[in-house]
Amino acid sequence: MAPALSPTRSHHVAVIGAGPAGLVAARELRREGHSVVVFEKQKQVGGTWIYTDEVESDPLSVDPTRSVVHSSVYRSLRINGTRECTGYRDFPFVVRSGVSRDRRRFPSHGEVLAYLKDFAKEFGIEEMVRFETEVVKVSPAAEEGIGKWRIESTEKEKKVRRDEIYDAVVVCNGHYVEPRLAQIPGISSWPGKEMHSHNYRIPEPFRDKVAVLIGNSSSAEDISRDIARVAKEVHVACRSNPADTFIKQTGYNNLWTHSMIESVHEDGSVVYQNGKTISVDIIMHCTGYKYHFPFLDTNGIVTVDDNRVGPLYKDVFPPAFAPWLSFIGIPWQVLPFPMFELQSKWIAGVLSGRIPLPSKEDMMIEIKTFYSTLEVQGIPKRYTHRMGNTQFEYDNWLASQCGCSETEEWRKEMCLANGVRKEAHPETYRDEWDDHHLVSEAYQDFSLYS
């Protein structure tokens, strides 16, 4: 075990992004006694939860010269986890007063944004944020001393470029901006329209069209039903489905689930692995996103390879730069806000010297062992950061490092019950449930923070 930093030492820390991860990072860093500056490109807090009707000029979002739109939120989006599970651990996502608030248990994106603004107001986060300021480069500043970082940023309105030195950098820029695309044989000569779900907002452009959605994520599930209200036909293709899959969705006359696309052709047809051939107008990729840190220059030490960000100890610290560079929010298939909170507490405590880290050598050994385990299990590199059922073990490990209580039993049970309900009743799980006893347990805990 490497020695901790000087006890209760305060550092000048830059946080990149004022979304859900950046907000709680700023709070925890300041609580630990650090001096914090948050860089945010947009005019307000909220990150990807800030809805906009704007979409990118390139519907596939591959043109490097395009004007990037940060949000991937579509107009009809409602959260797919319960309100109780979604919120930060010590700032519950409860129904608040206000005529414009969404009181549903699975509220809209607008309610999540309002919650994040409530959080920022409650803890005075905005006073730490430089809005409309884009970080263009983050790089080690070795000439300034061990662990120092140079941040180059530009302010949109003032057109001011700053070059500043920080002791540490916490990266919280989200990962719902740079789309991943499916590889489809014949796509270069297919005459129809392609797009990524990042640029989906409303169903109207799909009226009377035949659309194919690729993917099995929550977004594919929700958007396919949204579009089916106006489209002629909607076909959902997924590579994880058996090759003979062809299922008409209950309650719809125009929505089908297929196996993956085998090929597309110049006549506009799409051929599936199940043998079906359909003439299609639009293909939408609901295929997720790439981790993307265009501002980060580490001379190749921290890389993104097939969507593996590495090397990272516990998905947070790159050993070569620990603890002066860290990442929040890399794992997926998790309850994000509670995880962000625990990661933030850990980072803040490590930086202050209160919590020790292993040596760089020991961190690298653990990372390599983890990578080897994934390889032996046949798990693709792109799933390195997928947690799913292991998320609570991870959260509890973080909690043990920080001296916090473990994940509440009600939160674990509620999350698992919601997953079962969602799979069995994708149409109604947001509005019909039977876990009232867990809701009562949650609100008993929430009373501690009211």
UniProtKB/Swiss-Prot annotation:
It comes from the Eukaryota. Pfam families: FMO-like. Its cofactor is FAD. The keyword NADP applies. GO terms for molecular function: flavin adenine dinucleotide binding; N,N-dimethylaniline monooxygenase activity; NADP binding. Keywords: FAD, Flavoprotein, Monooxygenase, NADP, Oxidoreductase. Disulfide bonds: none annotated. NADP(+) binds at G215, N216, S217, S218, S219, A220. Its EC number is 1.8.-.-. The keyword Ligase does not apply. PANTHER family: DIMETHYLANILINE MONOOXYGENASE. Belongs to the FMO family. Catalyzes the conversion of methylthioalkyl glucosinolates of any chain length into methylsulfinylalkyl glucosinolates. This is Flavin-containing monooxygenase FMO GS-OX-like 5. It comes from Arabidopsis thaliana. The lineage of its organism: Eukaryota, Viridiplantae, Streptophyta, Embryophyta, Tracheophyta.
